[in-house]
Amino acid sequence: MYHLGDEYSQKAKREGYLARSVYKLIEINEKFSLFSSGNVLDIGASPGSFSQYAYKKLKRGVLVSVDINDISLRYVNNFYFIKGDIFSDDTASKINKFGPYSLVISDVAPKTTGNRLVDTSNSFNLNMRIIDLSFEVLLKKGNLLVKVFQGGDEMQIFKKFEKYFKFVKKIRPKAVRKNSFEIYFLGKSFGK
């Protein structure tokens, strides 16, 4: 989604990315070195900018992108797209088929209602599913990055990260819009 006047949207368009959100991932990766050898899972991949960047950073292994909506990316080698709902057993089974993963990234957000309490609750439930699914497919020492909405039960998510990862960090990248209440939680070195 490109919005005139937004520097990150204009930059994304110039550089061929599908969405401005890619600069959040780029900034986080430059600071915390998310990518290593191994498979990468992008949950909530639409419109596809996180997957575009992840594909460029892929060292060995495959990129698996999952979303309930189609994405326009079509790479020939080492790329698989799964159209499905992460709450479905069938989708989880397909994700498992390509694992394990050294990195799971998620920029997914629930459909927003405008009611912050409802939106943060929906974000929490979505992220708990992403985390549970990630714990099934992450390699020991793997990394997990998720977007969460502030103002609800997000600290429960952070505590779960602290329990299972050696390094955890709350991050608000510069590309996050000023009026947004989103932040990212990063967990590195799964399984302590």
From Swiss-Prot:
Gene3D superfamilies: Vaccinia Virus protein VP39. It catalyses: uridine(2552) in 23S rRNA + S-adenosyl-L-methionine = 2'-O-methyluridine(2552) in 23S rRNA + S-adenosyl-L-homocysteine + H(+). The keyword Transferase applies. Its EC number is 2.1.1.166. The active site is at K147 (proton acceptor). GO terms for cellular component: cytoplasm. Its main location: cytoplasm. Disulfide bonds: none annotated. S-adenosyl-L-methionine binds at G48, F50, D67, D85, D107. InterPro entries: RNA_methyltr_RlmE, RNA_MeTrfase_FtsJ_dom, rRNA-MeTfrase_E, SAM-dependent_MTases_sf. The keyword Cell division does not apply. It is an enzyme of class 2 (transferase). Keywords: Cytoplasm, Methyltransferase, rRNA processing, S-adenosyl-L-methionine, Transferase. Specifically methylates the uridine in position 2552 of 23S rRNA at the 2'-O position of the ribose in the fully assembled 50S ribosomal subunit. Belongs to the class I-like SAM-binding methyltransferase superfamily. RNA methyltransferase RlmE family. This is Ribosomal RNA large subunit methyltransferase E. It comes from Borrelia garinii subsp. bavariensis (strain ATCC BAA-2496 / DSM 23469 / PBi) (Borreliella bavariensis). The gene is rlmE.
